[in-house]
Regions:
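Short, charge-rich amphipathic segments
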Residues: 1, 157-162, 166
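Alpha-helical promoter-recognition and RNA polymerase-docking modules of transcription initiation factors
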Residues: 2-128, 132-151, 163, 210-211
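Acidic, proline/glycine-rich intrinsically disordered inter-domain spacer in sigma factors
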Residues: 8-12, 146-160, 173, 191, ...
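Conserved alpha/beta core segments of nucleic-acid transaction machinery
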Residues: 123-139, 179-211
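Short, basic interhelical loop/turn and adjoining N-cap
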Residues: 166-177
Length: 211
């Protein structure tokens, strides 16, 4: 087994109780640009797992923050974080410090991709379809609905369907179908409480230090 293939075996805190996990990952120091560059160079050129471990642990807070953005899909946040951590490890494995940008910038794509694939699998989008347009709808419909029709349940109005289809460059019927499917799936997944009610999510909030 090559050294780089061992990155998936790096030890990171277990995502059990979320508040405990968040407290644990705060203990890992953030890296300045120079330190990050040297660690990434050492990992890329020498396969130094200690360097890779520092790169991973210093970005666990980033994963947690990104994962919180997907909690509206009714899935356990600890599972979202675990999936995001896998994406982070892939980012570290492929990161080239000579490209001139920071690891966080590069890792965000991998983290989001890993979490999104998990959400798609969990929501059984195989039945809904997994075209580019449908994925775009799935991950943007709720946000746009909250912008143009906050708090509205049920079918969208014609003008709302038109607005969403224009913003996302998809067909109107796709908007209608996805909205109905997501509403039905939310009920089966015991979706989070509605906007304005936060009690059920108190234990899942990231503190301000992640902003």
């Amino acid at each position: 087994m090559s050294k780089k293939s061992q990155i998936s075996n790096l030890t990171v805190p277990s995502v059990g109780g979320l508040s405990i996990y968040l407290a644990q990952i705060k203990k890992f120091p953030m890296l300045d640009a120079e330190e990050e560059y040297m660690l990434a160079k050492n990992w890329r050129e020498n396969g130094n797992l200690k360097a890779a471990h520092k790169l991973v642990t210093s970005h666990l807070r980033l994963v947690a923050k990104i994962a919180m953005g997907y909690r509206g899909y009714g899935l356990p946040v600890n599972e979202l974080i675990s999936e995001g951590n896998l994406g982070l490890m892939q980012a570290v494995k492929k990161f080239d410090p000579e490209k001139g940008f920071r690891l966080a910038t590069y890792a965000m794509w991998w983290i989001k991709a890993s979490i999104q694939e998990y959400v798609l699998r969990s929501w059984s989008l195989v039945k809904m379809g997994t075209t580019t347009a449908q994925k775009k709808l799935f991950f943007n419909l709720k946000k746009i609905k909250n912008q143009i029709a906050p708090g509205q349940d049920g079918d969208l109005k014609d003008e709302q369907v038109d607005e969403i289809s224009k913003r996302l460059d998809v067909e109107s019927y796709e908007v209608v179908n996805m909205n109905r499917r997501m509403m039905g799936q939310e009920k089966s997944l015991n979706a989070p409480i509605k906007s304005g009610e936060t009690d059920e999510w108190q234990d899942w909030l990231v503190d301000d230090s992640l902003d």
